[in-house]
């Protein structure tokens, strides 16, 4: 299997996000890397499902609550940016203050 650097990055995000999902399901709070990976993964999957950039930016503020992350994480995550593939091409999606 030959993967580009971008594909390797996305695979790493997916791996970390699956770990984050398991931890959330067990009632554990996410740390900074897990929270960012989880948010990025949901953007990638939303784009794959055909959602627009605007929809993802709006929904992205509802995916994680402060009580689902470790203390201090919301203050560290002011924005998450990820390039996602949409039906009309690759676009940058930015989530502003996504953990509320």
Swiss-Prot record:
Keyword Transferase: no
One Pfam match: Urease_gamma
EC number(s) on file: 3.5.1.5
Pathway note: Nitrogen metabolism; urea degradation; CO(2) and NH(3) from urea (urease route): step 1/1
Gene Ontology cellular component list: cytoplasm
InterPro entries: Urease_gamma, Urease_gamma/gamma-beta_su, Urease_gamma_sf, Urease_subunit
GO biological process terms held by the UniProt record: urea catabolic process
Keyword hit for Hydrolase: yes
Enzyme class: hydrolase
Domain of life: Bacteria
Subcellular location(s) of the protein: Cytoplasm
Catalytic activity annotation: urea + 2 H2O + H(+) = hydrogencarbonate + 2 NH4(+)
Keywords from the named record: Cytoplasm, Hydrolase
One GO molecular-function entry: nickel cation binding
Cross-referenced Gene3D superfamilies: Urease, gamma-like subunit (3.30.280.10)
Segments passing through the bilayer: none
Subunit annotation: Heterotrimer of UreA (gamma), UreB (beta) and UreC (alpha) subunits. Three heterotrimers associate to form the active enzyme.
Database matches in PANTHER family: UREASE (PTHR33569:SF1)
Family according to the record: Belongs to the urease gamma subunit family.
Name of protein: Urease subunit gamma
Native species: Parasynechococcus marenigrum (strain WH8102)
Phylogenetic placement of the source organism: Bacteria, Bacillati, Cyanobacteriota, Cyanophyceae, Synechococcales
Gene: ureA
């Amino acid at each position: 299997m030959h993967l580009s650097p971008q594909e390797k990055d996305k695979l790493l995000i997916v791996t970390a996000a699956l770990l984050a999902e398991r931890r959330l399901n067990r009632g554990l709070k996410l740390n900074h890397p897990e929270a960012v990976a989880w948010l990025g993964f949901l953007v990638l999957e939303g784009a794959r499902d055909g959602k627009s950039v605007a929809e993802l930016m709006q929904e992205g503020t509802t995916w994680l609550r402060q009580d689902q992350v470790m203390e201090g994480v919301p203050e560290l995550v002011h924005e998450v940016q990820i390039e996602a593939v949409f039906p009309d091409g690759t676009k940058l999606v930015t989530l502003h203050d996504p953990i509320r």
